[in-house]
Swiss-Prot record:
Protein family (similarity comment): Belongs to the peptidase C58 family.
Functional note: Potential cysteine protease. Avirulence protein, which may be essential during infection of plant cells from Pea and some Arabidopsis thaliana cultivars. May act by affecting the plant defense system. In plants lacking appropriate resistance (R) gene, it probably impairs the plant defense system and leads to the bacteria multiplication. In contrast, in plants containing the appropriate R protein, it is unable to induce disease symptoms, explaining its avirulence name.
UniProt-recorded name of the protein: Probable cysteine protease avirulence protein AvrPpiC2
Region (Disordered), start-end ranges: 1-39
Keyword match RNA-binding: no
Enzyme Commission number(s): 3.4.22.-
Biological process according to GO: proteolysis
GO molecular-function term, one example from the UniProt record: cysteine-type endopeptidase activity
NCBIfam families linked: yopT_cys_prot (TIGR01586)
Keyword terms of this UniProt record: Hydrolase, Protease, Thiol protease, Virulence
UniProt-listed SUPFAM superfamilies: Cysteine proteinases
Length: 269
């Protein structure tokens, strides 16, 4: 998760990652194939039944004595890079191997480096946009930063969803409000799922209040099955027809209401 407001610049940048002493076993990330380990965040039944492997960006760094810091954009881009490289086998074994690499010291360093580039670019663009502050400026800066960070991985991302409410936001509004009640806009959620299935591979971003959270996605060639990687929870495989429910369950498990969404279609340069 990344803060998309002007406060992002207040986080110090890490240009290098150094290993220190590992945290106690109780605070370390378990093996991604061991679903029953009590250190994992508990999943709702709807997600646990489609889980291929587990992951948690908040504790994987503990295994290497590295300070915790959100790196969902870096992890999602690393995951998509593996998918493009042909490592897209949809089996619990292959999924666990992908998660093990992402959680390894090398995987964390790669993800943190890319995410730090994203964070630094975002800070720079936010400073440029300071003359016109607001959610729109922050979101635009975040979009451009993600596109540039993807270039480091040899990926070309293209945002495909467009908000039609003249809000000026570079994402699709995914909620509707009735009085004090805010609920998911089913039409927007349907557009999100259609974009994922149509574009096959890429990064999905959830915009929730002042937080942006990135997930990777990959869809089978026939469009019938989808794999989602959430850096907070792990890898999930579902029928495309159940994609909307899966995304809602993930956002609920993450505690991130779907305020806005964007799909960044991914291609290799």
């Amino acid at each position: 998760m990344t803060i998309v407001s002007g406060h992002i610049g207040k986080h110090p940048s890490l240009t290098t990652v150094q290993a220190g002493s590992s945290a106690s076993v109780e605070n370390q990330m378990p093996d991604p194939a061991q679903f029953s380990d009590g250190r994992w965040k508990k999943l709702p039944t709807q997600l646990s039944s489609i889980t291929l492997a587990r992951f948690d960006q908040n504790i994987c760094t503990n295994n290497h004595g590295i300070s915790q810091r959100a790196m969902c954009f870096g992890l999602s881009l690393s995951w998509i890079n593996m998918i493009h490289a042909g490592k897209d086998h949809v089996t619990p074994y292959a999924s666990a191997e992908r998660m093990r690499f992402l959680g390894s010291f090398e995987g964390v360093v790669h993800a943190r480096t890319v995410h730090n580039f994203y964070r630094t670019e975002h800070k720079f663009l936010m400073e440029q946009a300071s003359a016109n502050p607001g959610v729109s400026s922050g979101a635009m800066a975040g979009t451009e930063s993600l596109l540039q960070a993807a270039e480091l991985k040899g990926l070309k991302l293209q945002p495909v969803l467009e908000d039609k409410s003249n809000s000026g936001l570079p994402f699709l509004i995914a909620c509707k409000q009735s009085g004090r009640q805010v609920s998911t806009d089913e039409a927007a959620l349907s557009s999100l799922c259609d974009a994922i299935v149509e574009n096959k591979r890429g990064v999905m971003v959830i915009y929730s209040q002042e937080i942006a959270h990135a997930l990777g996605f990959s869809v089978s060639s026939d469009g019938k099955r989808a794999t989602l990687f959430d850096p907070n929870l792990g890898e999930f495989h579902t029928h495309s027809k159940a994609l909307a429910d899966t995304i809602e369950n993930i956002s609920s498990a993450d505690g991130l209401p779907l305020i806005g969404v964007q799909v960044f279609a991914s291609k290799i340069h």
